[in-house]
């Protein structure tokens, strides 16, 4: 008898979409029940999004362990919890462990919360999932969800928070801090939301502020592109933060040169110091090279400062690595130029897409 394959066929995704149960069962004439996707995750059919209930039942009856782990230790129920699929309920009925964590200590409830699946969170709570279980970072499902939540997820986040707190999760000061970050994220991107969506998110944020005792975030005031650009901060760092909130759009380039020099230095700072230069490319280099040009516009910086900016830029290598203080000084020079040029200067064509 020929040895069966340990990996699923490459077109298994397509077979799932078609949904022909007999064709799916036939896969296992040549594949082991434990056959996985052949990728790094080692996902069996039970881990797949959209796997038909009939196939799930058949595989388990044939002997496939309902709690078989993937590469990271995630069970099928764990994976389905991230998708928010009703397959979670079926797997539970078949013996799926609602508490079994992955190798990092994340339980199915952690994943349902982090992926903002309120219906799955409700089901897992009803079935006795430990709402206070902590992963290796010491996060409960609630804290984990708040940590990764952006403003766009405020509505399901509020629903999940109410359920978990009602189930016995203790509120901590750290949670209030996370809620304020969620509020700031939404305010920064508010213009990208429809009026109806804004109302929904505002309502959800109000709930979150009240639940966690967090300070409500003030609505963002965006520069009109015409009025003089004025700041109140007494230090350049305070002024930089003011200018960022005032001039930077949620996506794409700024409308004014003033906004763009602030945006460029901020984007480069984030890519180098937070992201380690992983996405560094020609666009980032072109952004940097535009700074001395902008610093020479309008009421220009001194020749010494413009030359300094060129030297600083040259110290950022081709992998996006820079000496300490280089980006900080460029940010400071950007603020200095904006202060010298309060009247908005429209941004022309650019040769980058970051």
Write out the residue ranges for each language-model feature.
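N-terminal segments that cap or nucleate solenoid repeat domains
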Residues: 2-49, 54-59
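Ankyrin-repeat boundary/"N-cap" motif
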Residues: 5-12, 35-48, 69-80, 101-107, ...
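Ankyrin repeat A-helix N-terminal signature
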Residues: 14-19, 44-52, 79-85, 111-117, ...
């Amino acid at each position: 008898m020929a040895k069966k394959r340990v990996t699923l066929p490459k077109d298994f995704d397509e077979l799932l979409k078609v949904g022909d149960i007999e064709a799916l069962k036939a896969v296992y004439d040549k594949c082991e029940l434990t056959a996985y996707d052949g990728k790094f995750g080692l996902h069996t059919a039970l881990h797949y999004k959209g796997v038909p209930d009939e196939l799930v039942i058949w595989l388990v009856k044939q002997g496939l362990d309902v709690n078989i782990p993937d590469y990271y230790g995630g069970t099928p129920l764990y994976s389905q919890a991230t998708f928010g699929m009703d397959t979670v309920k079926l797997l539970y009925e078949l013996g799926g462990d609602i508490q079994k964590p992955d190798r990092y200590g994340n339980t199915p409830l952690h994943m349902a919360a982090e992926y903002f699946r309120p219906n799955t969170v409700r089901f897992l709570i009803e079935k006795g999932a430990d709402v206070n279980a902590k992963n290796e970072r010491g996060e409960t499902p609630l804290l984990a969800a708040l940590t990764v939540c952006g403003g766009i997820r405020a509505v399901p986040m509020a629903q999940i928070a109410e359920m978990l707190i009602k189930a016995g999760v203790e509120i901590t000061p750290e949670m209030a801090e996370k809620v304020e970050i969620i509020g700031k994220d939404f305010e920064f991107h508010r213009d990208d939301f429809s009026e109806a969506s804004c109302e929904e998110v505002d309502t959800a944020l109000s709930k979150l502020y009240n639940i966690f005792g967090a300070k409500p975030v003030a609505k963002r005031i965006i520069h009109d592109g015409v009025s003089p650009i004025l700041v109140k901060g007494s230090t350049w760092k305070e002024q930089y933060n003011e200018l960022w909130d005032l001039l930077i759009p949620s996506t794409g380039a700024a409308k004014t040169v003033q906004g763009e020099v602030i945006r460029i230095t901020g984007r480069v700072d984030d890519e180098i110091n937070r992201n380690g230069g992983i996405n560094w490319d020609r666009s980032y280099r072109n952004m940097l090279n535009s700074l001395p040009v902008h610093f020479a516009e309008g009421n220009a910086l001194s020749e010494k400062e413009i030359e300094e900016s060129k030297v600083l830029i040259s110290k950022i290598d081709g992998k996006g690595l820079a000496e300490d203080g280089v980006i900080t000084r460029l940010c400071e020079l950007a603020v200095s130029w904006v202060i010298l040029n309060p009247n908005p200067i429209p941004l022309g064509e650019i040769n980058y897409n970051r």
